[in-house]
């Protein structure tokens, strides 16, 4: 009995499933389709044999790339060798991708099957996968798929920004569309303005110039000799300007109203702006082609080379095409019609717009188109795979086409391809060295500018950080000066702090008994002179700062005394009065001691 297993690749890992009742399942495909939607019925058909989760997102990306390329990864090999039966002939493995199935069958020897009932079973596994694997939720499975999808796409879409060919494809498509639109709009302006000035159509053939003249002239009756110089600037021909002026005087056109003239002028200005944008777009296309495909543009021209790239889809696809495909690229309808009717196949497609085929004789058009397609294929491959693209090879290939064209006409033998390519290699090396030298110079200049910019930023940041510190210092300094100013002013005037001066008289008036006893004891111990009483006053004052105490002591010699203190500093009469007051105090103390 053949055992049918199914391999399912998911973003979180590989899953190997086994099917029950293989013969019935293969025969009854409609019943399988019904069971896929129901989880209970699907469990009766399929069971999970093994699940190999990926250890990291990088491992998942490696396995996804291997599966897409048809390569058997080591993780997949280990899973199949471990969990599939050893008898390989009795095992049938169902896979979704035929490429990976062929690789498994070639390397491991298991018979693989795709399509049919396998596709339906894989559809059911994909639908119920989060229910088959324990611990896996639908949300986590979706997140894993999203992350792997982004990583896989990012790896596939990597490209060089400076050599992107998508801009060329869009530019040439827009350029062709603009040519059609400008032609259509110009014909509309000619018909519209031709009712008023029909002779101008015969004089001016260029569409853009005609629209500029219609915008400038307006009403033909207002055209005079003063506008002749401006007409010469627009037409760039004095004879045509004179013919326009003469035709306006004897024109057969009908009169036109102001509102119609305004509409014609506005529409003409739009056509003129479109033609100017078309010129700027053509310049942009030329510069882009010189960056992306310089050899191809030097060989066949920017417009034809861009059309070849756009028709192929990319420069890489064009480089993969053989010369026979490049020759008929753009003539697919004629080719299939010829194959269908068994007629002659076309000789050229888009390369017909090249100047070489137009210059060749009728009998040599097929030859030169085949030779030109060969050189275009070589040039596209050089542009696609060279590290430093240059136009040297394209110029040499163009010279070869010119020599071959002259050979068809005159019989002059052209140079050998080997000699031409040797010269091209020497010139290409020199050009590549020059380009690298310029790039190095530009890189050095950029680094210097970056260093200067970083130094300027660092200097500005240091200045900004030092500015607040200076502001703090300047804000602190005036505060200190304000505190010291009153003391300095009082000291200069010979006065103390008013709080100190007012506190002293109060202390003299209110003495307690203990203070009086201490003062009498000091007088009895000493000489009882006046200076000893004065020494007791500073002891009662609290001194916090030694500098302030010194400042307070020094001005006592100079300060002006109040009227209450004047008797203390007067002559011998005051000294006698003070002695009498001291004797009275002694008597009071004696009485108090006797009473106690």
Curated annotation (Swiss-Prot):
Family, per entry: Belongs to the NOP5/NOP56 family.
Crosslink (Glycyl lysine isopeptide (Lys-Gly) (interchain with G-Cter in SUMO2)) position: 87, 230, 240, 539, 564
InterPro entries xref list: Nop56/Nop58, NOP58/56_N, Nop_C, Nop_dom, Nop_dom_sf, NOSIC
One biological process term in Gene Ontology: ribosomal small subunit biogenesis
Pfam families, per the entry: Nop, NOP5NT
Compartment list: Nucleus, Nucleolus; Cytoplasm; Nucleus, Nucleoplasm
Biased composition (Basic residues): 582-596
PROSITE patterns: NOP
Residues bearing PTM Omega-N-methylarginine: 359
Highest taxon in the source lineage: Eukaryota
Function per UniProt: Involved in the early to middle stages of 60S ribosomal subunit biogenesis. Required for the biogenesis of box C/D snoRNAs such U3, U8 and U14 snoRNAs. Part of the small subunit (SSU) processome, first precursor of the small eukaryotic ribosomal subunit. During the assembly of the SSU processome in the nucleolus, many ribosome biogenesis factors, an RNA chaperone and ribosomal proteins associate with the nascent pre-rRNA and work in concert to generate RNA folding, modifications, rearrangements and cleavage as well as targeted degradation of pre-ribosomal RNA by the RNA exosome.
Annotated segments matching region Disordered: 458-596
Keyword Acetylation: yes
Residue numbers of Phosphoserine PTMs: 314, 465-466, 510, 518-519, 536, 562, 569-570, 581, 583
Subunit structure: Part of a large pre-ribosomal ribonucleoprotein (RNP) complex, that consists of at least 62 ribosomal proteins, 45 nonribosomal proteins and both pre-rRNA and mature rRNA species. Within this complex directly interacts with TCOF1 in an RNA-independent manner. Core component of box C/D small nucleolar ribonucleoprotein (snoRNP) particles; the core proteins SNU13, NOP56, NOP58 and FBL or FBLL1 assemble stepwise onto the snoRNA. Interacts with NOP1 and NOP58. Interacts with NUFIP1, RUVBL1 and RUVBL2; RUVBL1:RUVBL2 seem to bridge the association of NOP56 with NUFIP1.
Sequence ranges assigned to domain Nop in this UniProt record: 292-410
Protein name: Nucleolar protein 56
Ranges of biased composition (kind: Low complexity): 569-581
GO cellular component: box C/D methylation guide snoRNP complex; cytoplasm; nucleolus; nucleoplasm; small-subunit processome
Keywords: Acetylation, Cytoplasm, Isopeptide bond, Methylation, Nucleus, Phosphoprotein, Ribonucleoprotein, Ribosome biogenesis, Ubl conjugation
N6-acetyllysine modified-residue sites: 560
Gene Ontology molecular function: snoRNA binding
């Amino acid at each position: 009995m053949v055992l049918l297993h199914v391999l399912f690749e998911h973003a979180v890992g590989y899953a190997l499933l086994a099917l029950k009742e293989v013969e019935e399942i293969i025969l009854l495909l409609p019943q399988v389709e019904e069971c896929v939607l129901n989880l209970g019925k699907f469990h009766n058909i399929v069971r999970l044999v093994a699940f190999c989760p990926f250890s990291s997102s990088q491992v998942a990306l490696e396995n996804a790339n291997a599966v897409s390329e048809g390569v058997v990864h080591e993780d997949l090999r280990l899973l199949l060798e471990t969990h599939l039966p050893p008898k390989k002939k009795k095992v049938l493995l169902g896979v979704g991708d035929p490429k990976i199935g062929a690789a498994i069958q070639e390397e491991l020897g298991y018979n693989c099957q795709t399509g049919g009932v396998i596709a339906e079973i894989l559809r059911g596994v994909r639908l119920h996968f989060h229910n088959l694997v324990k611990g896996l939720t639908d949300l986590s499975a979706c997140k894993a798929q999203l992350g792997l999808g982004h990583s896989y796409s990012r790896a596939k879409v990597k490209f060089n920004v400076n050599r992107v060919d998508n801009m060329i494809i869009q530019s040439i498509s827009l350029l062709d569309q603009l040519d059609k639109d400008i032609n259509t709009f110009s014909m509309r302006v000619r018909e519209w303005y031709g009712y008023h000035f029909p002779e101008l159509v015969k004089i001016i053939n260029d569409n853009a110039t005609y629209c500029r003249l219609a915008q400038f002239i307006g009403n033909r009756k207002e055209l005079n000799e003063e506008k002749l110089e401006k007409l010469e600037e627009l037409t760039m021909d004095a004879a045509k300007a004179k013919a326009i002026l003469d035709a306006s005087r004897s024109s057969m056109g009908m009169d036109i109203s102001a509102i119609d003239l305004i509409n014609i002028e506005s529409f003409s200005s739009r056509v003129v702006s479109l033609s100017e944008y078309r010129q700027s777009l053509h310049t942009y296309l030329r510069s882009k082609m010189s960056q992306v495909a310089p050899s191809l543009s030097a060989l066949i021209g920017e417009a034809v080379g861009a059309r070849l790239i756009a028709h192929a889809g990319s420069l890489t696809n064009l480089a993969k095409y053989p010369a026979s495909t490049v020759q008929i690229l753009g003539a697919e309808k004629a080719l299939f019609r010829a194959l269908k009717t068994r007629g002659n196949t076309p000789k050229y497609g888009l390369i017909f717009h090249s100047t070489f085929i137009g210059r060749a004789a009728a009998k040599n058009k097929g030859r030169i188109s085949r030779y030109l397609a060969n050189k275009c294929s070589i040039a596209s491959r050089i542009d696609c795979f060279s590290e430093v693209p240059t136009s040297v090879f394209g110029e040499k290939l163009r010279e070869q086409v010119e020599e071959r064209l002259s050979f068809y006409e005159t019989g002059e033998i052209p140079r050998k391809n080997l000699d031409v390519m040797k010269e091209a290699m020497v010139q290409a090396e020199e050009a590549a060295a020059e380009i690298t030298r310029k790039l190095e110079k530009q890189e050095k200049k950029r680094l210097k500018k970056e260093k200067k910019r970083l130094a300027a930023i660092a200097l500005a940041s240091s200045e900004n950080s030092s500015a607040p510190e200076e502001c703090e210092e300047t804000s602190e300094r005036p505060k200190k000066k304000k505190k010291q100013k009153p003391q300095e002013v009082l000291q200069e005037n010979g006065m103390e702090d008013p709080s100190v001066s007012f506190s002293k008289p109060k202390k003299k008036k209110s003495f307690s008994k203990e203070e009086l006893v201490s003062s009498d004891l000091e007088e009895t111990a000493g000489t009882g002179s006046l200076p000893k009483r004065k020494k007791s006053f500073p002891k009662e004052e609290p001194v916090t700062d030694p500098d302030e105490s010194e400042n307070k002591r020094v001005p006592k010699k100079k300060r002006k005394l109040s009227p209450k203190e004047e008797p203390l500093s007067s002559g011998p009469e005051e000294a006698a009065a003070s002695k009498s007051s001291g004797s009275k105090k002694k008597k009071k103390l004696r009485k108090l001691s006797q009473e106690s």
